[in-house]
Amino acid sequence: MQDNVIIDTSIFTNPNIYKSISLEQPIDAIEAFIGLTHKSSKKIYMPRTVYIELCKVVDLESIKSRFESSIIIKSPNRCNITINALALFDFVEDMRIRINKGLRIAEEFARDKTQDIQNTISKLREKYKEALRQGTLDSKEDVDVILLALELNGVILSGDEGINSWADKFGIRTVNPLFIQEFLSF
């Protein structure tokens, strides 16, 4: 049986991951990944929203045709995928908790008059982002990875904590992206 593998940008933009493919820059890792896909029996997919995001982060112009010939750019069929109501309930509850935590962080920083404003804003942004986004689905691109994996009964290859956490909730198989080369060679 051939695996359908769904990838996201993290395997090309997270230095800890892309350096397991190529020790150079993200574009070099993408080129090496393309080479791996040609030797693999697996079908590699990337949701269109993720592809658009990747193109904003990495200049793919020099390898765009090879990329699009090697990786299937496909949006999930959002109209025909059914999501378990409990998952939606859990997501809303998780977001409520995160928003409340974010408000507490903002209040804490608003009360702290001892730091300079630039330093305070920088620390606030970091803590707020961690509270609201880390470990959850925080973008439409993340949701598309999950939906496409559900649609294709696929395996997710991602370094995104939120994607991997929600993949686990949906019973979607994930592979540690640090093992990309080994995974694609089987």
Curated annotation (Swiss-Prot):
Listed EC numbers: 3.1.26.5
InterPro entries per UniProt: PIN-like_dom_sf, RNA_free_RNase_P
One of the GO BP terms on file: tRNA 5'-leader removal
Record's catalysed reaction(s): Endonucleolytic cleavage of RNA, removing 5'-extranucleotides from tRNA precursor
A Pfam family: PIN_5
Cystine connections: none
Alphabetically ordered keywords of this record: Endonuclease, Hydrolase, Nuclease, tRNA processing
Enzyme class name: hydrolase
GO molecular function terms noted in the UniProt entry: ribonuclease P activity
Family assignment from sequence similarity: Belongs to the HARP family.
PANTHER family found in the cross-reference section: RNA-FREE RIBONUCLEASE P, UPF0278 PROTEIN TK1425
Function, in words: RNA-free RNase P that catalyzes the removal of the 5'-leader sequence from pre-tRNA to produce the mature 5'-terminus.
The protein's name: RNA-free ribonuclease P
Organism whose genome encodes this protein: Hydrogenobaculum sp. (strain Y04AAS1)
Lineage summary: Bacteria, Pseudomonadati, Aquificota, Aquificia, Aquificales
